[in-house]
Amino acid sequence: QGTVAFFDLQPGLKLALWPRQSLAADAGLPLTATATAMSLAHNVLNETDVDAIMQQASMAGAPIVKSPRKTFWGGYAGYFQDPDSHLWEIVWNPDFLP
C-alpha cells in the first residue's frame, strides 16, 4: 500500500510520512483535496484502548470513518474525524511498544 517512513522524535513520539493515496486507501476514503491529506495517529498500549477511545470519540459525535480492526501489518486501528474534519487514527502497533 505504499512506503511509509517513521521518524523517532522523542521517546514515545514518532512521525510517520506516507503517500496521500495510501492514507486514503487505508482509511477507506476517496482521494480528494481535503483535510484528510494527513492524519494524526495516537498510538496506545493495546487493542482495548483503541476500542475505548474510538467509542469515546463516537459518543462525542465524531464520525467514525473506519471502525477498529486488525491491520495488514499486525496491529489494530480505527479512524475518526474531528469537528474540523481532520483524520485521527487510534492505533495499537506492537512494534512501537517499549
Predicted regions and their residues:
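Core segments of cupin and vicinal oxygen chelate
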Residues: 1-24
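Vicinal oxygen chelate
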Residues: 5-8, 28-98
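Residues in well-ordered beta-strands of folded domains
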Residues: 16-18, 41, 91
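Non-catalytic surface loops within mature trypsin-like serine protease
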Residues: 11, 21, 44-46, 82-84, ...
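Short, basic, helix/turn surface patches
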Residues: 22-31, 91-98
